UniProtKB/Swiss-Prot annotation:
SMART domains per the UniProt record, alphabetical: Ribosomal_S4, S4
Naturally occurring in which organism (per UniProt): Ralstonia pickettii (strain 12J)
GO molecular-function term, one example from the UniProt record: structural constituent of ribosome
Role played: One of the primary rRNA binding proteins, it binds directly to 16S rRNA where it nucleates assembly of the body of the 30S subunit.
One Pfam family linked to the record: Ribosomal_S4
Organismal lineage: Bacteria, Pseudomonadati, Pseudomonadota, Betaproteobacteria, Burkholderiales
Region (Disordered): 33-54
Full protein name: Small ribosomal subunit protein uS4
Keyword annotations from UniProtKB, A to Z: Ribonucleoprotein, Ribosomal protein, RNA-binding, rRNA-binding
Oligomeric and partner information: Part of the 30S ribosomal subunit. Contacts protein S5. The interaction surface between S4 and S5 is involved in control of translational fidelity.
S-S bonds: none
PROSITE patterns on file: RIBOSOMAL_S4, S4
Amino acid sequence: MARYTGPKAKLSRREGTDLFLKSARRSLADKCKLDSKPGQHGRTSGARTSDYGNQLREKQKVKRIYGVLERQFRRYFAEADRRKGNTGETLLQLLESRLDNVVYRMGFGSTRAEARQLVSHKAILVNGQALNVPSAQVKSGDVIAIREKSKKQVRIAESLTLAEQSGFPIWVAVDAKKMEGTFKQAPDRADIAGDINESLIVELYSR
């Protein structure tokens, strides 16, 4: 399945919640009706969505939030299922520990897509070494920094300013002036914001 390149707001409307694909720090709720489906007047249907439909919809939503394709997502679930503990929570922790997501959480990119681009263009250092693999897993204590020659990019400075205003997640420590941060640990489930019901995904793959 190819990566979606169409209007970002349309995906958020389809899921009925802001996926933060277009703007990481500003909600789409003020710009469009998230409670109506895409279309001129929104698609309506009297049919009740099945349990399977709800489970599939939740999986699609999480894939879109983190920008992960189906094959990657299955691998993440298999790894989460293999580990001890709550499978759904572990799945979200694995997704949150992706390098592109950590770059986004530290405010270097205004969206995950922009953060992924920074990683792919070798603008990111991990423990002093350039790493251009968006899916790389970040570990506790890893230091993420903007490469020296990329620090002059206006979009990075603007994104950091917005991130400082809205606040950073508690599992990262960011020095905005140095344009670097430390990944303290994978987040607890309670610290992961967003309208996500990971139990539906576990149910889907347990069918």
